Amino acid sequence: MKVLVATDKPFAKVAVDGIRKEIEAAGYELVLLEKYGEKAKLLEAVKDANAIIIRSDIIDAEVLDAAKELKIVVRAGAGYDNVDLEAATAHNVCVMNTPGQNSNAVAELAFGLMVMAVRNMYNGTSGTELMGKKLGIHAYGNVGRNVARIAKGFGMKIYAFDAFCPKEVIEKDGVKAVGSAEELYSTCDVVSLHIPATAETKNSINYALVNKMPKGGLLVNTARKEVINEAELIQLMEERTDLKYMTDIMPAANETFAAKFAGRYFSTPKKMGAQTAEANINAGIAAAKQIVGFLKDGCEKFRVNKK
């Protein structure tokens, strides 16, 4: 069996070493395709692969058509909108993610962005503190829980909204559950976004919702750019000069945001949430173990597509 690690944005070496150890211990061959740049190289590499580990790499119908021997794709990370799930099901390919492995890294970055914003991008002027501020966590999954844990250390008042997470699960962590996204945004000084990009959530973070935030509101996005209605957020930030937007996902309209909202907007140059050695190791090794479990025992615990 051949396991391909296809990462245009490579894992840290220590993570690759851990993946190799898991794969070779199971008697499988590991092949690396790193910084490949051109899709043609990926199409060639997948031809004889039985399993693929990816990060943010795109696995679409064309890639699946080329991968005649493919049985499983594992996305090393939580989000999997870079994989065409319907096409994978049509090709009888199992798709998995590795939930929770990057959660602390993403949560820590969210706080890095928060501190940068409230200290006025470190421009030498007096900023404010996070202590005592109301933090809203939009989606209380693995990352959201880590954000809540860290927020306690900052002395913040913590609120959360998650349509799929029971109130008692949220409140057992000492977090106040609210009944709607509208209530969360109207209550909180800072909102940290952790919702996935789905048909229901795309463009859902819009003018009407963000405009509910109190004066001096700060929106932090370490989720997906697709959930932001960029045109409406630009309009709102033009009208409300008190709002700030910090994102780990560069918007399509990045140049417009940067030109119009200097001092109130920041984007990382590429998605950095999972860019730590620890997250690399955790997610990469989890992906390798899931592949071994699937190929040897048929384990589909973290399957995200239909059969």
Question: Each predicted region: which residue ranges?
Answer:
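Phosphate-binding beta-alpha-beta segment of Rossmann-like dinucleotide-binding domains, i.e.
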Residues: 91-153, 168, 294, 298-305
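Phosphate-coordination loops involved in phosphoryl transfer and adenosine-cofactor binding
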Residues: 70, 131-134, 207, 216
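Rossmann-like adenosine-cofactor binding region
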Residues: 47, 61-64, 165-259
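NAD(P)-binding Rossmann-fold cofactor-contacting core
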Residues: 153-171
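Rossmann-like dinucleotide-binding domain for NAD(H)/NADP(H)
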Residues: 95, 109, 207, 215-307
